[in-house]
From Swiss-Prot:
A single GO BP: positive regulation of DNA-templated DNA replication initiation
Membrane in keyword set: no
EC number: 2.7.7.7
Assembly behavior: DNA polymerase III contains a core (composed of alpha, epsilon and theta chains) that associates with a tau subunit. This core dimerizes to form the POLIII' complex. PolIII' associates with the gamma complex (composed of gamma, delta, delta', psi and chi chains) and with the beta chain to form the complete DNA polymerase III complex. Interacts directly with the psi subunit (holD). The only subunit of the DNA polymerase III holoenzyme known to interact with single-stranded DNA binding protein (SSB).
UniProt xrefs under InterPro entries: DNA_pol3_chi (IPR007459), PolIII_chi_sf (IPR036768)
This protein's name: DNA polymerase III subunit chi
Organism of derivation: Pseudomonas aeruginosa (strain ATCC 15692 / DSM 22644 / CIP 104116 / JCM 14847 / LMG 12228 / 1C / PRS 101 / PAO1)
């Protein structure tokens, strides 16, 4: 069954979620996992795309927009994930997508911004009611 991890970030800045998303994607990619970053909108996806290119100085995380290269180890999308991305879903939307059960793990990133925090509470309740194993991670300041 899919395991859902909530990463609680001590920041009110929604862009802190993108920084943590890059860290998680890099770690998963280095472990050989296929990663799907489910973005809320095109602006968020574009910003995340730029961050992944320059995440660690001259190094970058190999990635692609989901509709451009389904074989990239890290895909950024707005809808259904490419067929081979089933290891880690990093969900940056305010809802739990219907394709959650297709993944081994799901990462939900939470900041102190009221709308994001409330959406996270709603998703936590939803996942718990569906019987998903839940894990809570309190991150240090970034």
């Amino acid at each position: 069954m899919t395991r859902v991890d909530f990463y609680v970030i001590p920041s009110a800045d929604p862009s802190a979620r993108l920084q943590v998303a890059c860290r998680l994607a890099e770690k998963a990619w280095r472990q050989g996992m296929q990663v799907y970053l489910h973005c809320a909108d095109e602006a968020q996806r574009s910003e995340l795309d730029g961050r992944l290119w320059s995440f660690r100085g001259e190094a970058f995380i190999p990635h692609s927009l989901a509709e451009e290269d389904a074989e990239a180890p890290v895909a950024l999308g707005l809808g259904e994930p490419p067929g081979n991305h089933r290891d880690l879903l990093i969900n940056l939307t305010l809802e739990a997508p219907g394709f959650v059960p297709n993944f081994s793990r799901v990462a939900e990133l939470v900041v102190e911004e009221p709308a994001i925090r409330q959406a996270a509470r709603d998703k936590f309740r939803f996942y718990r009611e569906q019987g998903y194993p839940l894990q809570d991670h309190r991150l240090p300041r970034i």
